[in-house]
Amino acid sequence: MIKSFLLLFLFFIASSASAQKSTAWYHHTLLDVQNLESSVAFYTQVFQADTIPYPFPPSPQYIVKWLKVGEGVELHLSQWVNNNNKVIRDLPSEPGHLGLVHLGFMVMSMDSFLTRLMEVSTDYKSGKYKQPIIDRMPYGAKTIEIKDPDGNEIHVIEAMPKKRSTNR
């Protein structure tokens, strides 16, 4: 009994220690699609994703729908069209190939993340990629765009502190 309790106790300590180690987590994927309406229908029906508000001003050429898939994970679907509502952005012609635009991650501290990026990324240390410039999302969160060693875009957003309730 004591041995079982001790093993259970050690498991919880190890779990909480590993949970505290990561300061970044997966946030969203942006996919370019050929038909936004059918893609939204697919993800909302098959995966029971919920639509969420798009926080930027609308554009007639760039049509976007944001979906919440599970807890804290988003799928952003986009479609580029011309004035005649025809898709203008070339997508991979191979069926089943993702139209991946960028990966999105959230971090606890943008400053700490940038320091780590500049310290550990050979491409940023060597000057292959310039240090990213911090921008802000419409709701105020710090954001940057970086690239991985293959040149894939990664969108990094600093987590906003949760508002404290004044009701007691």
What residue ranges belong to the model's regions?
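Positively charged n-region of N-terminal signal peptides that target proteins for export
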Residues: 1-5, 20
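N-terminal beta-strand motif that seeds the catalytic metal site of vicinal oxygen chelate
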Residues: 18-38, 100-103, 157-168
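Core segments of cupin and vicinal oxygen chelate
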Residues: 23, 30-75, 79-80, 137, ...
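Flexible, glycine-rich phosphate/dinucleotide-binding loops
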Residues: 58-61, 84, 160-163
